[in-house]
Amino acid sequence: MLCAVYKTRKKEGMYLYLPKKDNFADVPEPLMEMFGRPELVTILALDKRERLGLVDKQKLIDELTEKGFYLQMPPKEENLLETHRESLGLSKTPDKKF
């Protein structure tokens, strides 16, 4: 199975996977408006790949088959201040004292 992978300039790390190159017919219009002008990144041969980085291969295949597209969202950014406070045994956010 082949799929086309597109990126957006609107949000780094967001990718749209399609079962056919340049066939956006199954992608909802509001999603296309939010995604913006898609830029082709690559064509993947899913049968020849065991892993796909951050994407679950079986979920990708299922979504392409059922919905006709798959939207990969960027990974959640870690809040370094909250992580540091937790490592010190503090709450994630400081108490507000005015």
UniProtKB/Swiss-Prot annotation:
Residue ranges, annotated region (Disordered) = 77-98
Recorded hits in PANTHER family, A to Z, give: PROTEIN YCGL
Q: Which HAMAP family does this chain map to?
A: UPF0745
- The YcgL domain extends over 1-85
Write down the InterPro entries for this protein, in alphabetical order: YcgL-like_sf, YcgL_dom
In its UniProt entry, what is this protein called? Answer: YcgL domain-containing protein MADE_1012200
Coiled-coil residues: none
- An example of a Pfam family matching this protein is YcgL
Gene3D superfamilies with a match to the protein in the record = YcgL domain (3.10.510.20)
- What organism does this protein naturally occur in? Alteromonas mediterranea (strain DSM 17117 / CIP 110805 / LMG 28347 / Deep ecotype)
